[in-house]
Amino acid sequence: QNELAELLGAQEEMLSVVPSESEVGVSTIQVTEDGYYFAAYSSVTSDTLEEEVSDGRTKSFTKASHGYILDLGYAKSGDVIRIKNSNNERVDITAYQLNMDALDTAYETLNSQTMELTSFSDRKITGTIDVEKAGNLVFSIAREDGWTVYVDGKETEPETFAEAFISVPLTDGKHDIELIYTTPGL
């Protein structure tokens, strides 16, 4: 997330590491600043992790053995967040606080010039965009074989944004965009 935020113009990290402690059966975060908190964790054999916050809030995270980032929600300074596991094993976590300024900067960058969708189906997307400042149009579509991109009717080689998404460079002005997907090998 921090790399993506930087690519989108944020000057600060979107997720900042905050101190946490882990021992057998429970990991603890002492909240020192109001904000949204998340946690990444090492592998567990338990399929469920339980969050308990000192304000009385609780939450269960199922399929924990699959591994994902836990959304711990909003917490206030002075709160204590505990993450417990039923197998009574040590689960090392890395806790993060969301930097809202970095999130807002990234959001504004993404939202400042958007494509207006004119049609879509399971294999074709068309739209228009009026570009005020030349840059890259990034799609929330995975960069994989099979996609062909047309800008103003001309086939354009797609680029990759953040090692994951389809992106195409655009000049100032109005553009017609078309993406067509054909299953590779057909």
Predicted regions and their residues:
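Active-site-proximal, structured, solvent-exposed surfaces of multi-pass membrane proteins
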Residues: 1-186
